[in-house]
Design a protein with these regions (language model features):
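Active-site-adjacent structural elements that line small-molecule/cofactor binding pockets in enzymes
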Residues: 1-203
Length: 203
């Protein structure tokens, strides 16, 4: 069994980096940064907790890649409604290059309502969110694997799109899908993912 480090992005950068160095020094397997923009809070009137500093995940991962030289790194997981899949693929390829081939792309349907509302992203219905996840996974996988990608989907459209760098020294960047919904998520995992993240308990 491998052990990884999943820090909160609501802590100061110096503390997060110290935790990453400690994880690497102990031989841990990976560092996973949560992909959120603010503290989770009830939707409605603005909550004071939303003003607490929260580090953006991909910027944080790039810094970790440069300063922590061995462990795997990735977002756990990147909500597909936050960024266009082509942007995610481009960031993943760049992160893999910076890190010398240690990046993992984590994707999920997205769930935190307050950040979607505050930034005007729109969560959509349950089926829409999982349709978007399915299209995003297929698009990111193709962008990282193929020379050019064309997609005419309901949520993703690409026209002969390239994505370079797409993996350090020809590496195939692993795609991780987060979630445990039996009707949609598991099918998406089976079709597209190299790895699967879920919440689970021994019992």
């Amino acid at each position: 069994m491998d052990v990884s480090f999943w820090p909160t992005s609501a802590q100061p950068w110096a503390d997060l980096l110290a935790g990453c160095h400690a994880a690497e020094a102990r031989g841990w397997h990976g560092i996973w940064v949560p992909d959120h923009f603010m503290t989770n809070a009830p939707v409605g009137a603005p909550d004071p907790s939303e003003l607490h500093p929260w580090l953006e995940s991909w910027t944080t991962l790039a810094a970790v890649a440069a300063l922590v030289p061995r462990v795997r790194i990735g977002a756990m997981v990147c909500g597909v409604g936050y960024r266009h899949p082509a942007v995610v693929a481009k960031m993943a390829g760049t992160l893999d290059e910076i890190s010398g081939g240690r990046a993992v792309v984590g994707l999920g349907a997205g769930w935190q309502e307050n950040e979607h509302r505050r930034y005007g992203l729109g969560t959509g219905t349950g089926p829409e969110r999982f349709d978007r996840l399915e299209e995003a996974c297929a698009a990111v996988r193709s962008l990282l694997d193929e020379e050019r990608t064309t997609v005419e989907g309901d949520h993703v459209r690409l026209d002969a799109a390239p994505c370079e760098p797409s993996g350090h020294a020809g590496r195939r960047i692993p795609l991780l899908v987060g979630g445990r919904g039996p009707r949609r998520t598991l099918r998406t995992v089976a079709r597209h993912a190299d790895e699967w993240n879920l919440w689970a308990f021994p019992e």
